[in-house]
C-alpha cells in the first residue's frame, strides 16, 4: 500500500508573478512539469479588471492551482475583483506590496504600500470578507530608509491583525526611486536571515521566502526555516528545474518530468489555441528556455525564433524544433 504523503503548505513551492512572463500560456507550460507547484498570474490592477475592454481573468482551469496577484489600494475595488476571481476558479488572491516601479507607485500600489500598513490591512480585510479562498500578501523586507526589522514586524503585525495569515517575503528592501525594477531585484542585498527571524517571531503565520533562489538544494535549505519558497526568473529561464520539484519537495515517488515530455504534452494545447486565433509566437516565447544546457538547445531556440512569428505558423514549427533536441 502506498504511504500517505505528508500535508504540505499549499505554497511550499511557487513560481513568482512576473510581468509579461507568467501569462496563461506560460503557466500552462509550467503546469506540465509539476502537479504541485503554485503558479501566479502576472500582476493585474484592480482598475484594469473593472474597466478593461477584454478579460484579464481568463485562464484554463487545468493551470490550477493558480493565484491571482492584484495591484491596488482601494479596498472596495479589490473586494470586487477578489470575488470575481473566486467565481472564475482561482485558488488564491495575492496583494502586491512589493513592486517598486514608478508606474506602480503612481497608481498607489506595490511596495510603496509598505508605508501604509493600515490601508493594506483594510484591503485584506475587505477581500477576505468577500471570498473563502486564501488572501495573501507579497512584500519586501523594507523600503527606502524604512528598513529596520521593527518596521517589518510592525507592518506584519498590523496586516495579520486584520486576518492575513500568509505572507510571501522578497528578502530584499526596495528603493522607491533611483533604481529600476530590474536593479531593485539585484542591487539591494538579500537578507534571508531576517525572513527566518520573522517566522520565528510569528510562528503562527505562514511565511514563504523569495529572492535569488535557483537550486533544489537552496530550496531545501530555506524550507528548514520557513514554510514555502517562491522562485522567479530561474523557473522561467530554466523551466526544466520545475520538472524536479514534485519529487524533491512533495512526493519522493513522483516522476521527474523532462523538458521533452513537457513540450510534447503542450502540443494539444498549442493546437487548441491556434484554432482560436492565438498567434504561435505568443505561446512559444515562453518555451524557448526549455532545453537550457541540453544538446540541440541553440537550434531549438533559433528555429522557433526565426519561424514562430511568421504568418500562418502552426504546430509543425514546434514539432520541427523539437526534432533538434534529444529526448
UniProtKB/Swiss-Prot annotation:
Site residues, Interacts with tRNA: 96, 182, 185, 298, 301
Active site: 99
Cited CDD domains: DUS_like_FMN
Cofactors, names only: FMN
Alphabetic keyword roster: Flavoprotein, FMN, NADP, Oxidoreductase, RNA-binding, tRNA processing, tRNA-binding
One Pfam entry name: Dus
Catalytic activity: 5,6-dihydrouridine(20) in tRNA + NADP(+) = uridine(20) in tRNA + NADPH + H(+); 5,6-dihydrouridine(20) in tRNA + NAD(+) = uridine(20) in tRNA + NADH + H(+); 5,6-dihydrouridine(20a) in tRNA + NADP(+) = uridine(20a) in tRNA + NADPH + H(+); 5,6-dihydrouridine(20a) in tRNA + NAD(+) = uridine(20a) in tRNA + NADH + H(+)
Sites where the protein binds FMN: 17-19, 69, 138, 170, 210-212, 232-233
Enzymatic class: oxidoreductase
Molecular functions (GO terms): flavin adenine dinucleotide binding; FMN binding; tRNA binding; tRNA-dihydrouridine20 synthase activity; tRNA-dihydrouridine20a synthase activity
Source taxon at top rank: Bacteria
Annotated EC: 1.3.1.-, 1.3.1.91
UniProt cross-references to InterPro entries, sorted A to Z: Aldolase_TIM (IPR013785), DUS-like_FMN-bd (IPR035587), DUS_fam (IPR001269), DusA (IPR004653), tRNA_hU_synthase_CS (IPR018517)
Function summary: Catalyzes the synthesis of 5,6-dihydrouridine (D), a modified base found in the D-loop of most tRNAs, via the reduction of the C5-C6 double bond in target uridines. Specifically modifies U20 and U20a in tRNAs.
PANTHER family: FMN-LINKED OXIDOREDUCTASES SUPERFAMILY PROTEIN
Membership in a protein family: Belongs to the Dus family. DusA subfamily.
Protein name in the entry: tRNA-dihydrouridine(20/20a) synthase
Biological source species: Haemophilus influenzae (strain ATCC 51907 / DSM 11121 / KW20 / Rd)
